[in-house]
Design a protein with these regions (language model features):
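A short, glycine-/small-residue-rich helix N-cap motif at loop->alpha-helix starts
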Residues: 17, 56-63
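Short beta-strand-to-loop element that shapes/binds the nucleotide-sugar donor at the catalytic cleft/hinge
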Residues: 104-130
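Short amphipathic alpha-helical segments and helix-helix/interface helices
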Residues: 19-25, 68-69, 168-172
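Catalytic core and acceptor-binding pocket of nucleotide-sugar-dependent glycosyltransferases
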Residues: 133-248
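A structural signal for short, well-ordered beta-strand segments and their strand-loop junctions
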Residues: 33-36, 80-84, 106-107, 181-186
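GT-A fold catalytic core of metal-dependent nucleotide-sugar glycosyltransferases
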Residues: 60-107
Length: 248
């Protein structure tokens, strides 16, 4: 049975893999919406770029939240899911039950390196109030509380380590939820098929440049560090791994 909650994407430019993602996610969701648009003065006027990735790219990663918020407020949508354009849901779960009383349930690695500071929205379940709270938090940090971001950025500069401050950093500081999609009941959501880490470091067995995945009765499993099969409820074809999406 398909989910009654809508699934949102944010994709301001044309990319070939979006259509494949939409095609596959239509198996799980009745309603899929692609939000576009890049104008967001309330954010752009306060943003301070502290990242080795491009300014334009990092701005869009933040702007997506404001654009989706505008749409759901105008259309009276109280609960929804979001995924990146290179992410695929594999199973229709009871997303409302997972959300319960939380403002948001996202992907927060239990084990993180020094100044990694990430919580990902690439698979996430939201309430309207939760998204509005997060957008307000972003504005407040860049306006009044930017000091909480500086230690991480200074570490990147001093160590000449790539990355920096991004939307996942702000979400890391904002996110107070007790739930974690990497710790879903009965399985997990994927951080990225090109990395062994998920909730913890070196969590999954690799085959070449991607996680070793098995299709058992039309369900996708990975093998964890305890040699146990773990079902994936969603796969993230991040970076140069997007071509693997076409194998589903």
């Amino acid at each position: 049975m398909k989910s009654n909650l809508p699934l949102f994407y944010y994709q301001p430019n044309d990319v070939p893999y979006l259509e494949k993602s939409l095609e596959l996610n239509k198996r799980i969701f009745k309603d899929l919406l692609v939000i576009k648009g890049t104008d967001c003065p309330e954010f752009n006027n306060v943003y301070k770029h502290m990242c080795y990735n491009s300014d334009a790219f990092e701005r869009l990663c933040f702007i997506r939240f404001f654009k989706i918020l505008k749409y759901i407020k105008e259309n009276n949508i109280d609960k929804f899911l979001y995924c990146d354009s290179d992410a695929i849901f594999l199973k229709a779960l009871d997303f409302e039950k997972i959300l319960q009383d939380e403002k948001c349930v996202a992907c927060r690695p239990k084990e993180q390196n020094k100044f990694e500071d990430v919580t990902g929205a690439h698979f996430s379940i939201w309430t309207k109030d939760g998204l509005e709270d997060f957008c307000n938090y972003i504005i407040d940090v860049y306006t009044n509380n930017i000091d909480i971001l500086l230690p991480k950025w200074e570490w990147h500069v001093e160590t000449k380590t790539g990355g920096g401050i991004c939307d996942m950093t702000l979400m890391y500081h904002w996110y107070k939820g007790k739930k974690n999609l990497y710790e879903a009941i009965g399985g997990t959501f994927d951080r990225g098929i090109g990395m062994p880490q998920n909730n913890i470091a070196d969590e999954f067995e690799m085959k070449g440049d991607i996680k070793r995945l098995r299709n058992i009765d039309n369900q996708i499993f990975g093998t964890n560090y305890n040699d146990e099969l773990v079902e994936f409820f969603g796969l993230h074809f991040q970076g140069d791994k997007k071509n693997y999406m076409y194998n589903l």
